[in-house]
Amino acid sequence: MLGWALTFLIIAILAGVMGFGGIAGTAAGIAKIIFFVFLVLLVLSLVANAIRGKGPKV
């Protein structure tokens, strides 16, 4: 039980440092870029499978 308390304490400290240190805004910007990159890759994959005549696996 003490191990879990220490683990969550460390996680809380790291979250506080990232949140108050300005890293959160940068991380959010990077996450948006990665989201759109993978969205484009998804669309390309769907188009490529449609051209080949393969349907999505269900």
From Swiss-Prot:
GO annotations of cellular component type: plasma membrane
Protein's cellular compartments: Cell membrane
Domain of life, source organism: Bacteria
Transmembrane domains' residue ranges: 4-24, 27-47
One Pfam family hit: DUF1328
Keywords tagged on the record: Cell membrane, Membrane, Transmembrane, Transmembrane helix
Chief place where the protein resides: membrane
Tagged with keyword Hydrolase: no
Family of the protein in this entry: Belongs to the UPF0391 family.
Protein name: UPF0391 membrane protein Patl_4137
